[in-house]
Amino acid sequence: MPEIAQAHTPMMRQYLETKARYPDAILFFRLGDFYEMFFEDALTASEALQITLTARSKGDDKVPMCGVPYHAARGYVARLLEKGFKVAICDQVEEPGKSQLVKREVTRVVTPGMVLDDQVLDPREASWLGAVALDDGRAGLALLDASTGQLQCGEVDGDERLVDELRRAGVRELVFSSAADGARAEAIARAVGAPAARRDAAEFERAEDRLRKHLGVPSLDGFGVSGLPLGLAAAAAALAYLADTQRAAPRHVDRISRLSTDDVLLLDEATRTNLELERTLSGGRKKGTLLALLDRTVTAPGGRRLAEWLRYPLTDLARIGARLDAVEELTGAAVAREELALALRPVADLERLLSRLVLGQGNARDLRALAGALLALPALAAVLEARGAARLREAGARLRGLEALAAHLDAAVAEEPPATLREGGIIRRGHSAELDEIVAIAEDGKGWIAALEAKERERTGIGSLKVRFNKVFGYYLEVTRPNLHLVPKDWERRQTTVGGERFVTPELKTLEEKVLTAEERRAALEERLFEALRQAVAAEAPRVRTAADAVATADALLSLSRVAAERGYVRPEVDASEALEIVDGRHPVVEAVLPDGPAAYVPNDVLVASRDAPECAEHGALLVITGPNMAGKSTVMREAALVVLLAQMGAFVPARRARIGLVDRIFTRVGASDDLARGRSTFMVEMTETAAILHNATRRSLVVLDEIGRGTSTFDGVSIAWAVAEHLHDVTGCRTLFATHYHELQDLARERPAVRNLTVAVREVGDRVVFLRKLVQGGASRSYGIEVAKLAGLPAEVLARAREILKNLEAMEVDEGGHPALARGRRRRAGPSAAQLGLFGGGAAADPAAEEVAKAIRAIDLDALRPLDALNLLAGWKKSLE
């Protein structure tokens, strides 16, 4: 950035001085009807926004510049935010012409985590800022949504857990102390995938005192956040960042809650991704996810609340039961659902309207929308209070108490106000007598002048009297010479002309002032009245926040009941046991997208219990699931995880019957993907996720594993899969669904009492294979991979060759090098050296090493040999023969 030199114009010096205070932001500098950018900002913005880069002359130099129209700035700001930039908005804070240089100030700084504009925000997604306070081995975190005023704080052990919580929330931006370890903070930000800001360490200090002062309470005990020094430090820093960037006191943040993992079902990033809760694995779309299926909400806050429940399922039986009671009542009452939907429809986004108004960024249209929403609350409250479920009645009660504010706003704000204050017409007629008079003058100034002229003619008897105007004298009364003797003594002479004289009266001067300054006074008075209304809203912020919370809750409950009623879901039994019993369960998303409709879905039972639970004797704790590709193993396992998640978020489930013993964590290891950016192969990703499961799963966890070990050699893969299964059975003892193509793992059931074998049934009809999609007791004997390849459309000659190779492999045919005779036909043509050999020789001379292997095989007691031991022996023999 160039030095602030006298060579620059006053305006450019003003720009440079402002830019120096915001070096990490792109400065939008208001010049008339445009926001202009200069120097490096212009170069950066023109490239990011694909707008024309021009230049401004400064002596012999050219200053790079670009600009965007003032009225279209929001869209450009949104695009810069998407690319991770901050934008400082520098506005004109006085009317041009009042001084040589218009006064300008930064009115707000828009960052990825500090967005209030409803045209930039996704109405159905929260916009979280994550503030982090680091200590040795422990971290405090705070989540703040500036657009709704929600503030939560908590503490976690270890950076891995911290990253997981930040990613679960979907934070848009991170804030760290300037005193924090830079490398550690950078690693956390990189893992979370969010831009980070470093703030003065003082913003993290004296946190409890500052929070008490902001919230106006003598103690934080009532919020349940005591004993969290790091969490409170992060919360104080988040509030400071909000106040600094928005240039306003965040009065809408009137409470703080504890961000606790003790009473929620934990879902790590891999699990959320694998279960496709909010984004599909293919393409990262919303359509095709569980959230898209469940979201039948009427309001945007309801949609955000539903997403929150999906991210944070419960482990508190009482809270789960209360939600289920409400969903059950609405599911069985179609008329009540329709009444509730109709009552919710006129309720705008109270949370975000309140935030914009309190922070000084709202306009008259926001006030009108707020008035309309508040006016609709009594009817909504009546619908909810008429219900039987406690959660519904409580929500209705929390909507009361805002009737006076609603009436005040409705009486004050015009029905269809303009977008900006300066356009005028934001206040209703009748709200302010002073404003009504000013507006009348502004709208009918000529009529007022004509009325005064007529009145003075009648009073004086001067028939030729005229009220005229010029720029020098303003309004005046003009009297011809023959009538000068009729001029009253209270008139004041201003000018003598050839034909007569010009006068003014006190009334005319008053009227002149009113008429000439009416527009300016109207704008100023409307601004004062608007500010008074804004302050009235801010004074009721706590009640509005409470009502907004109730609206969101009622809408989310309605959405769950709509889905349950339309799709035939049932109320799950959620208890303190360690059993999982799903009878005729269905995958909610898969059944919804079947071309032949949900009736075509084949339901399945999943019955499993932790190793030490009474139900384990019947169900088992570890289900080894085998079966061909495409038969539906992965779908059934995901279905079980989703049924648990739905039940613990308080929703009905797609099943004929479901009993869910509380689960503390769901782990899934499904699918395979490289992490090339971090130099990790598919197998490394698989092993890292598996290690996390083995280290963190408890007896109450649900573990879903699909094809563990397939990313390496067969022997290594089987060995790892076997050992992982043993650990989950012997050490963890949790409910585990373990799908595999390693049929050797079926032998675990002989050695481990809580292991059960299941397979997905198939039927062979001639040379065709029909997948029945049904889990049955027992193990699979074949994988039917070639049949799946046929379905995928592989050429016939490739399929024929594959069958030939498969027969060779199954017969253990090997060539003289000890390898399966995969290219037998070609090698025959090559000469006698490729003749088919027996498994242990059969050539001209016996191999001593092969003879030793054969001798060892003959000595084995097959009935006492474990599969894992057999694999180890095979590996040793192979090595001795190489």
Curated annotation (Swiss-Prot):
<comment type="similarity">
    <text>Belongs to the DNA mismatch repair MutS family.</text>
</comment>
<dbReference type="InterPro" id="IPR007860">
    <property type="entry name" value="DNA_mmatch_repair_MutS_con_dom"/>
</dbReference>
<dbReference type="InterPro" id="IPR036187">
    <property type="entry name" value="DNA_mismatch_repair_MutS_sf"/>
</dbReference>
<dbReference type="GO" id="GO:0140664">
    <property type="term" value="F:ATP-dependent DNA damage sensor activity"/>
</dbReference>
<dbReference type="InterPro" id="IPR007695">
    <property type="entry name" value="DNA_mismatch_repair_MutS-lik_N"/>
</dbReference>
<dbReference type="InterPro" id="IPR027417">
    <property type="entry name" value="P-loop_NTPase"/>
</dbReference>
<dbReference type="InterPro" id="IPR045076">
    <property type="entry name" value="MutS"/>
</dbReference>
<dbReference type="Pfam" id="PF05188">
    <property type="entry name" value="MutS_II"/>
</dbReference>
<dbReference type="InterPro" id="IPR017261">
    <property type="entry name" value="DNA_mismatch_repair_MutS/MSH"/>
</dbReference>
<dbReference type="GO" id="GO:0003684">
    <property type="term" value="F:damaged DNA binding"/>
</dbReference>
<dbReference type="InterPro" id="IPR036678">
    <property type="entry name" value="MutS_con_dom_sf"/>
</dbReference>
<keyword id="KW-0547">Nucleotide-binding</keyword>
<feature type="binding site">
    <location>
        <begin position="627"/>
        <end position="634"/>
    </location>
    <ligand>
        <name>ATP</name>
    </ligand>
</feature>
<keyword id="KW-0227">DNA damage</keyword>
<dbReference type="GO" id="GO:0006298">
    <property type="term" value="P:mismatch repair"/>
</dbReference>
<dbReference type="GO" id="GO:0005829">
    <property type="term" value="C:cytosol"/>
</dbReference>
<protein>
    <recommendedName>
        <fullName>DNA mismatch repair protein MutS</fullName>
    </recommendedName>
</protein>
<dbReference type="InterPro" id="IPR007861">
    <property type="entry name" value="DNA_mismatch_repair_MutS_clamp"/>
</dbReference>
<dbReference type="Pfam" id="PF05190">
    <property type="entry name" value="MutS_IV"/>
</dbReference>
<dbReference type="InterPro" id="IPR000432">
    <property type="entry name" value="DNA_mismatch_repair_MutS_C"/>
</dbReference>
<dbReference type="InterPro" id="IPR016151">
    <property type="entry name" value="DNA_mismatch_repair_MutS_N"/>
</dbReference>
<dbReference type="Pfam" id="PF01624">
    <property type="entry name" value="MutS_I"/>
</dbReference>
<keyword id="KW-0067">ATP-binding</keyword>
<dbReference type="GO" id="GO:0030983">
    <property type="term" value="F:mismatched DNA binding"/>
</dbReference>
<keyword id="KW-0234">DNA repair</keyword>
<dbReference type="Pfam" id="PF00488">
    <property type="entry name" value="MutS_V"/>
</dbReference>
<keyword id="KW-0238">DNA-binding</keyword>
<dbReference type="Pfam" id="PF05192">
    <property type="entry name" value="MutS_III"/>
</dbReference>
<dbReference type="GO" id="GO:0005524">
    <property type="term" value="F:ATP binding"/>
</dbReference>
<comment type="function">
    <text>This protein is involved in the repair of mismatches in DNA. It is possible that it carries out the mismatch recognition step. This protein has a weak ATPase activity.</text>
</comment>
<dbReference type="InterPro" id="IPR005748">
    <property type="entry name" value="DNA_mismatch_repair_MutS"/>
</dbReference>
<dbReference type="InterPro" id="IPR007696">
    <property type="entry name" value="DNA_mismatch_repair_MutS_core"/>
</dbReference>
